Amino acid sequence: MNFTLARFVFQFAVSLDTASTRSNCKYLLLTSKKRKFTTAAIPLTHTSSEELLVVVGGGAAGVYGAIRAKTVAPKLNVVIIEKGKPLSKVKISGGGRCNVTNGHCADKMILAGHYPRGHKEFRGSFFSLHGPMDTMSWFSDHGVELKTEDDGRVFPVSDSSSSVIDCLLTEAKHRGVAPSVVLQTGKVVTTASSDNAGRKFLLKVEKRTMNLVECIEADYLLIASGSSQQGHRLAAQLGHSIVDPVPSLFTFKIADSQLTELSGVSFPKVVAKLKLENVQRSSPYLTQVGPMLVTHWGLSGPVILRLSAWGARYLFSSCYKGMLTVDFVPDLHIEDMQSILSQHKIRFAKQKVLNSCPPEFCLVKRFWKYILGREGLSGDTLWASVSNNSLISIARLLKHCTLEVAGKGQFKDEFVTAGGVPLSEISLNTMESKIHPRLFFAGEVLNVDGVTGGFNFQNAWSGGYIAGTSIGKLSNDATLKNRGF
């Protein structure tokens, strides 16, 4: 039988044409009652130009890495195997706008500090090899015009993730000489092993809609399957350990029905501190500053998401129970607040407290009513009737408002997980496994996760680029060696 690219059949059911070259290979069809297997017998005389890179996962890291490998080594055969739709997370990120990276972190030390898992390791060469500015230049050079918003988040000017997706898929299709990078969807790599010499990867690929298993022999393997169990399973089969994954970047469920009735109320800046029973010593990372939003189940917003990321494992082990202390007026000292309240009481003595909140506090009326209620004050109470002790209590409550965290947000809204292949088991300057040569990792399959703001995608771009570069160089070296250079 004739098969494309010497060792496998390519199918891509999204928007790309099938790219193929012909070469003769012997395949042995083995049938069983339940499944049909195809086993490839690879000719021993194949040349380095026939080397194959299989990328497991058609997300940001996988596609970017495949493109880079093909750029460095144009004759390298590259196939991406994705069980679903390629770049699906890119499509929905940033509310469909795609937060490509963060443009306010040119310094690698500052950038590394945005990764709860990875902040120590990323202080090295990782972002020096391919950082946010490199990512922005790459997309700009490939026709995606970008903009940087006030908080540093970088989006396509089109405000549509389709601009990023179209760019990546087009580049994957046209990159280098034939054959191009090929995407194979609707299939899952179920097992991975190596041959006796440890030079080849033997992969079994199952088609999701058919009882069919294909056997593929690859020279290089890049696992970039995100946080799915598939990637962790393959890594374990090839000798790697796995840090158990737990949710990161999620909202908090708050045990306060009066607060949740304020759904939609937002605060541009609060200081939130998370206290957990299983954390004996205070961690600076469990105190965060930023915007916060009240939801109908609790709290959300960047400050909460950052707390959930830094406290991901602590929260998991405590069954997502803890105490949250919020400073709603972080730019004012408590003594100044008490003085403001005392002066406000004198000035507006005959007004109802609900109708007259000190403007210095910048609080909406609905939340001001909530604060008064927690202090046992009726909104109809006149300012003249408010005791000095009550004024002190109001100031303290606004500076140290305690809220009980009762669990994660009720929806499966975590977008990122903590856990995966330990960074200690790979070389970050190449993304190659320290355990198995020619095995590479990139993206969320590793025990790396970032906070919101484009940092998780930057991890994907950087890891994919470094891995692709390393694979391409190895392939080129093999080509020169086979030619006698």
Where do the model's predicted regions map?
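Conserved N-terminal/central alpha/beta ligand/cofactor-binding core
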Residues: 83, 88-178, 294
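A conserved short coil-to-beta-strand element within the FAD-binding core of flavoproteins
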Residues: 180-199
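Glycine-rich FAD pyrophosphate-binding loop
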Residues: 54, 70-95
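Core beta-strand elements of the Rossmann-like FAD/NAD(P) dinucleotide-binding domain
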Residues: 49-51, 209-220, 287-288
